[in-house]
Amino acid sequence: MPADTPAGSAPARFDPAQIEPKWRAAWDLAGTFTATPDPAKQKYYVLEMFPYPSGRIHMGHVRNYTMGDVIARYKASCGFSVLHPMGWDAFGMPAENAAMATGGHPKDWTYANIAEMRAQMKPLGLSIDWSREFATCDEAYYGQQQSMFLDFLEKGLVYRKNAVVNWDPVDMTVLANEQVIDGKGWRSGAEVERRELTQWFFKISDFADDLLSALDGLENWPEKVRLMQANWIGKSRGLEFAFARTDGGDPIPVYTTRPDTLMGASFVGISPGHPIAKALAAQRPEVADFLAEVARGGTTEAALETAPKLGFDTGITVRHPLDPNWELPVWIANFILMDYGTGAIFACPAHDQRDLDFCRKYDLPVIDTFFALDDPTPVGDTAFVPPKTEPVRWVEHFAGLDIATGQEAIEATIDFAEAAGWGRGVEQFRLRDWGLSRQRYWGCPIPVVHCDKCGVVPERKENLPIALPYDEDGRPIDFSIPGNPLDRHPSWRDCACPACGAPARRETDTMDTFVDSSWYFARFTAPRAETPTDPAEVGYWMNVDQYIGGVEHAILHLLYSRFFARAMHLCGHLPESAREPFDALFTQGMVTHAIYKTTGTDGRPVYHYPEEVETTEEGAVLKKTGAPVDIVPSAKMSKSKNNVVDPLAIIDAYGADTARWFVMSDSPPERDVEWTASGAEAAFKHLGRVWRLAEDLRRNAEEAATAGSAEEARALARASARAIAEVTAGIEGFAFNKSVAKLYEFTNTIQKSKAPRAEKRAALKTMAQLMSPMTPHLAEEVWSMLGGIGLVAEAPWPEADPALLVEDTVTLPIQINGKRRSELAVPKDMPREEVEKLALADAAVLKALAGGAPRKLIVVPGRIVNVVI
């Protein structure tokens, strides 16, 4: 064994329990993964979305962080200066819930969980620079967050207003629209209510157009994520005009994206939060009762879309803008949002299902404004809502249209209204400002003070951080009482005004936890800096070159982070180049497992852990009783369904490399992977086979090097070159499963080869380098066994000799509609069908197809691939 690698005899068998800790200690001793800026090197910043410290890692963590680790290790071997950090998204309600349940403290619970999870993650062998670790509940972190809040406030990016909010009655806090799922709180599951409170908001809407247009430049993001964000931002062009009231009251302005359907208007609807509704409620008890009833429903579009339609006839009428003799009733309707458009609409039930349901319920008229070209049947119980691009036949359209698409009619109507002087075309966005106030203890305090003399006063930066109190004047904080403990903490709450020194009161709301995760990527570049970022460090490390995480964060976290990067740039904390913080995004699939269930005596399903079940040729049975078990294949791992696999148990039984190898091997990383015991066993056996190959070559190192033919040696060299090329391509293209498949094949080739032992040793050392990103511990062991110098983690990535690839491969240009867009390196003798499969999997082809199929796919063997769309 070389002198600069860990001492100790090689094990007599493949023993991960002996091998893996040894090499982790070696990496730590050498400081292998310490990120250091080096102007002479190109940098690479790889980041996985950091975890919430629940106290236990799961297989999803293993897959997610292994993916990032493969990229980080590969890039380091390619000569990049790599930043691969880890931290903890540590604020939030679960810690307070735990305190309520156990009588403990959220801080103690959180930091204990962090220690547990760190200890569980380190055995995975991740190439993380742990010296940069932080938790968002660290005072040093949220103190800098408070400093940025004050910067945002100074720039006009934060403001305070009364707003109807989503109130979670169980967690007793406000939820952002994105945190309300099907009308329920995303954590508690409670029915969300409407309440009007004074809240703090980030002015994300100021950036709506920029956030939307910049999506086109995110070419290395999944198209589905960009589409989800575009839909959430929701840019639309419509008509703004006002209905004149017949009683002489103030006109009612409306905004509509379908002004072409104005002749089908049935009523004017106003939001429960509209000034007219509020004024009526103050005068009429029946209106106040109605508003109280609808306040018990959710406030989001999704919640209101599915909720029963409720309305109240105000008795007010308005005049139609095209016919002053045509009067429309004004209804308060629970499905109308106050913070989109003007809080008032006109309803066209024939061409909007929501409006139609409302009109059928309250017996209001339904007027068709257009029909399908071949079907003049009036609307029944289903609204006729064709795509805007589909031509339809119009019923006496006031702009003179007969047959036209909806989009053409919209533009014609806007032109008509502007020419007539009663309306104007405007653009609107669905994206609304981000309400960040939360009525909870375990979050970042908002650094402002309320003074009777001065009003709302920003805290002085020299007083930051405004730290959370650990106790209440020496007594434990009682988290069992509903509400925010900070409201009940006078020694923390009561303070001097930073402006005049008079008695004042701290803001007791804390920040939404999505604030914490909206800038952590920048903090990792200089986690101990006395300012939010350090110009030199952030200038070197940003942007994040590769970001990895679940698609469930497409709207909440990713959109907020894009906003924060822009706001941080405006305040001088990020350079212009970092306004889009993530250059590339990869959204991984889940780790799944079969569900095993029987039926209980009460008829309800009983779920069983995988270790309680034995699978036979006839099916599955319980080990204890032999009772038959129903199997639900490949479901998301869930504690409630008992189909979870404990990563720690897998590591204890097989080693971390087996877990890493399996989650990389079985499926493309963007798809779900099903964990099976047989798959884990097969992965372990394969790694043992690689170890035995190395052990055999180590023990017989002195055998004559002349054994084996020159042709066998050349064949093995060609196989090594192909393995280097294909494993490299797989890692570069996030096709880790293809890299693993090639390494399986390469193992077989080495094992069967009759080449001289020196050549086999060289091939297996190459194998160790290629396996290092996936199975780093075994790779180090094999590298050491075969006389490799230093650590394989620090060895340069092998390069394939082009001469050894020439005779076996050919590069085919890929033309899309006659223009060269990509190329494909394939074996010369690859069947046409295999070339077609690879061509259809090419990134440029996938992007051009956009989920569709090509009209033609023409492969000219050895020359070109033509894709016709």
From Swiss-Prot:
PROSITE patterns: AA_TRNA_LIGASE_I
Endpoints of the signal sequence: none
UniProt entry keywords in alphabetical sequence: Aminoacyl-tRNA synthetase, ATP-binding, Cytoplasm, Ligase, Nucleotide-binding, Protein biosynthesis
Stated family: Belongs to the class-I aminoacyl-tRNA synthetase family.
A GO biological process held by the record: leucyl-tRNA aminoacylation
Coiled coil: none
EC number: 6.1.1.4
Protein location: Cytoplasm
Swiss-Prot/TrEMBL catalytic activity: tRNA(Leu) + L-leucine + ATP = L-leucyl-tRNA(Leu) + AMP + diphosphate
SUPFAM superfamilies in UniProt: Anticodon-binding domain of a subclass of class I aminoacyl-tRNA synthetases, Nucleotidylyl transferase, ValRS/IleRS/LeuRS editing domain
Molecular function GO labels: aminoacyl-tRNA deacylase activity; ATP binding; leucine-tRNA ligase activity
Principal place of residence: cytoplasm
Residues spanned by motif 'HIGH' region: 51-61
Motif 'KMSKS' region: positions: 636-640
Species of origin: Dinoroseobacter shibae (strain DSM 16493 / NCIMB 14021 / DFL 12)
Gene Ontology terms: cellular component: cytosol
Domain of life: Bacteria
Residues that coordinate or bind ATP: K639
Identification of the protein by name: Leucine--tRNA ligase
Gene: leuS
